[in-house]
Structure formats: C-alpha cells, structure tokens
Curated annotation (Swiss-Prot):
SUPFAM superfamilies: P-loop containing nucleoside triphosphate hydrolases
Protein family per UniProt: Belongs to the THEP1 NTPase family.
UniProt-annotated binding residues for ATP: 15-22, 102-109
Stated name of the protein: Nucleoside-triphosphatase THEP1
C-alpha cells in the first residue's frame, strides 16, 4: 500500500457485542493523537451497579460527554433504550465540524441512525476526511460500503491481527 493510499484509508470494524470494537477505536484514537489530529465521537456504555443503563456520546476533540440513550420509555427507542434527541445535535455538530487527520465514528448503528440528518452529516464528514475509523453495527454494513469504508470483522480470537491491520491501513505505527 502506498503512502497516498494509507493517507486516504477508510476502515471500519464490526463484530458481535462485547468483542472490543469501542475499546479498539479508543486505543487507535489515542495512538493516533501522538502523530496527527483526531476528531469524532465514541459511544460509551453507562453502567450503574454493574448493569448497562445507557450510552453517552464522547466528543474526542473536546472531551465532553452527553447522554445519548437511557433505559426507559419514550418516543424514540432502540430496544429498551430511549434516544435523547438533544445528543443528536451534538453528534451532528461533531460530524459537521470534522476537520482532522483521523475521523473516528463510534458507531454507525441504530441509535445514531435515529438522529435526524445523521447519515447526511456522516457522509459529508467521511468524504472530507483523509482517514476514517468507524465502528459499524453489523446491521449497517451497507451504509459503510456505500461510504467506501472497508469493514474488518473483529472477534476475541483475531483482535490483535485486526488491531495491527487497522493501524497499518491508517498509516500508524504498530505500537
């Protein structure tokens, strides 16, 4: 792979719940920060007394964190979670302002897709970013393909190999 191809890499990771997709995305973002500007968002689990009760959106650029979804009843739901549409404004702002060497999107999934204009903002951000690392829910692989994101399957067994491949494709050292 040439340096130009590496400089324009758009890589996705998918896999079953709990295999470490978000952990890998955070690890790559932290490694990349040593060499380049990184922007985007990570969807973090919120736990209380050891039980998952929701998700927050973490803005990589600012370090701010806002609620995305919580267990409960409401108008916009994904499974047992109610999506906080005010978080959609934050996600849109993050994507619309994306101007960095590596855009991290965690995730392209059901909660994010519930946000009005998410896919429009996502497409613009992906097309304008030289490097992209996206966590892609397995039900949204078609979206990743349409955006030119090459998706790798992550499992507990291949975690280290996928990590190395992601770093290589993004032009980062195998640290």
């Amino acid at each position: 792979m040439t340096s130009r191809e590496r400089a324009e890499s758009k890589v996705g990771i998918t896999g079953m719940p709990g295999v470490g997709k978000t952990t890998l995305a955070m690890e790559v973002a932290n490694l990349a920060r040593r060499r380049m500007t990184v922007c985007g968002f990570i969807t973090l689990e919120v736990r209380e007394a050891g039980r998952r009760v929701g998700f927050d959106v973490y803005d990589i650029s600012t370090g701010s964190r806002v609620p995305l979804a919580r267990v409960g009843a409401g108008a916009v739901t994904v499974g047992k979670y109610v999506v906080d549409l005010s978080a959609c404004d934050v996600i849109k702002r993050i994507l619309d302002a994306a101007s960095c060497d590596l855009l991290v999107v965690d995730e392209i999934g059901a909660m994010e897709v519930k946000c009005p204009n998410f896919l429009v903002s996502l497409e613009k951000a992906v097309k304008s970013s030289p490097r992209v690392l996206a966590v892609v829910h397995r039900n949204y692989l078609d979206v990743a393909k349409r955006l030119g994101i090459e998706v790798l399957w992550l499992s507990r067994e291949n975690r280290e190999a996928v990590r190395e491949e992601v770093l290589r494709k993004l032009g980062l050292p195998l640290a």
